[in-house]
A protein has these predicted regions:
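Structural/interface elements that position substrates and couple domains in central-metabolism enzymes
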Residues: 189, 193-199, 225
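NAD(P)-dependent Rossmann-like dehydrogenase/reductase catalytic/cofactor-binding core
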Residues: 2, 25, 164, 171-180, ...
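Acidic/polar active-site rim loop that often engages polyanionic ligands
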Residues: 24-27, 143-153, 225-226, 245
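Rossmann-like NAD(P)-binding element
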Residues: 52-112, 120
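Rossmann-fold dinucleotide-binding core
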Residues: 112-183, 190
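NAD(P)+-binding Rossmann beta1-loop-alpha1 motif at the extreme N-terminus of oxidoreductases
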Residues: 1-49, 56
Length: 289
């Protein structure tokens, strides 16, 4: 039967995207956030995105049918019937640990608990639960409705059938699983992408090339749909910083240490599109100036 009910914790860019692709796949979704306003905005964003997919002929169902599968919740216990709970909050290990402890308490013993973390070790999150064998990583990429890959990460205690269920779920929602068999900092894709991003930031700081020209070069010469800095603004500079910092703290490897330019941007509040300014500047509607 596959996964029938999913609880998504966090209604930001990633959480709302995960909720959307689950609903589009026929799964009942309980979208949790402590902030009611955030949930309202998330539903509006999801509705707009679903509408665009329908306009392009990529979805057979109507918007109302898909949106009816998403239920907003502000109490944890309202998600207790989930077959799978996916945590999708920002990269703060203490917050994630707290969420995993609460999920472990309220969810059925058979419920799988996953994190969308891009860098924090799954093993550390599993350790605060009484079901480490049923904990895994499901790392989606932004924007979730558009990106096809999902990393399925095994922690040290993750059971084989849990990883297999994670793989099946990814296929169920129309994505492609990337199986990560060891719980290393940054998993697979970020360990490949981050060195390029760090070098790009260093080149800007050294005055070798501009943000615009580096992004243009990557689009035209490397076949990327978006440049490194365009992607960074969409994801959020604070998210990138948090992921790099987590990888550095986990591994002790200085190559993952967030570059000075990124650290300064984050301290200044230039967090990307959501803040109106990051590597680029944005209008109120999110379009680039």
């Amino acid at each position: 039967m596959g996964i029938q009910k999913v609880m998504v914790i966090g209604s930001g860019l990633m959480g709302s995207g995960i909720a959307q692709v689950c609903a589009q796949a026929g799964i009942q979704v309980m979208l949790y956030d402590v902030a009611k306003d955030a949930l309202v905005n998330a539903i509006k964003s999801i509705g707009w995105s679903v509408g665009k997919f329908i306009e392009k002929g990529k979805l057979a169902e109507d918007q109302d049918t898909i949106m009816a599968r998403i239920r907003r919740i502000t109490e944890f216990h309202d998600g207790k019937e989930a077959d799978l709970a996916i945590e999708a909050v920002f990269e703060n290990i203490e917050l994630k640990r707290e969420i995993f402890q609460r999920l472990d308490t309220i969810c059925h013993p058979k419920t799988l608990i996953a994190s969308n973390t891009s860098a924090i070790p799954i093993t550390e999150l599993a350790a605060v639960t009484n079901r480490p064998g049923k904990v895994l990583g499901l790392h989606f990429f932004s924007p979730v409705p558009m990106m096809q890959a999902v990393e399925v990460i095994k922690g040290a205690a993750t059971q084989d059938d849990t990883a297999a269920a994670g793989k099946d779920f990814v296929l169920q929602i129309g994505k492609e699983p990337i199986m990560v068999n060891r719980d290393v900092a940054g998993f697979v894709i970020n360990r490949i992408n981050f060195p390029s991003a760090i070098e790009a930031m260093n080149l800007v700081e050294q005055g070798v090339a501009s943000v615009e020209d580096i992004d243009k070069g990557l689009r035209l010469a490397a076949g990327r749909r978006m440049g490194i800095f365009e992607t960074g603004d969409m994801v959020g500079l604070d998210v990138t910083y948090g992921a790099m910092k987590a990888m550095y703290e986990e591994s002790g490897d200085p190559r993952w240490y967030p570059p000075l330019l990124l650290r300064r941007k984050v301290k200044a509040g230039h967090l990307g599109r959501k803040a109106g300014k990051g590597w680029y500047e944005y209008n109120e509607d999110g379009s680039r100036k």
